[in-house]
Amino acid sequence: MDSRLSAAYAIRAARISMIPGGVDGLVINYAEGGEPAWVQYPLKKQKPLPNNLCYTPTLEDIARKREAVIAKYTKQPLETGTTFTHVLNASHLNEQYTRVKKSALPDKEFPIIETEKYPEPPILWETTIGAPSRLFDRSDGVKYVR
């Protein structure tokens, strides 16, 4: 084969292999002598776990947590106070404050203006492991309903 012809092909092949484009670049024609270059994909970013200090929640995570909190306080019926029936002095007892097992109102963002029945927000006592007392049905200081 003529060496001049192969030199021309070699130059053309070198030019073809230098065509940029990365992953989705132009397809190299093997018949023309082009050699595909090794493609370097960008490194996959590792997302930190929720227990990591570098973890930042996505909007989806925030929405999921928000839905869980809303469901916790709105889907379950709130407990009401007990009314006394068939008990001696029932009318007097019903006029008094009666105990409610769980805190019937949320402890965060308590609407203090609208609620004349509850003069101050309910106290949620911290237990030994730091969970709010409403999880354990513990009674607390101001959980009374009229």
UniProtKB/Swiss-Prot annotation:
Transcription regulation found in the keyword field: no
The keyword Nucleus belongs to this UniProt entry's keyword annotation: no
Keywords: Capsid protein, Late protein, Virion
Triggers of expression: Expressed in the late phase of the viral replicative cycle.
GO cellular component: viral capsid
Subcellular location: Virion
Top-rank taxon, per record: Viruses
Subunit text: Interacts with the major capsid protein.
Cited function: One of the minor capsid proteins that constitute a network internal to the major capsid proteins and outside the lipid membrane. The minor capsid proteins glue and stabilize the capsomers.
Name this polypeptide is given: Minor capsid protein P5
Organism: Paramecium bursaria Chlorella virus 1
Gene: A526R
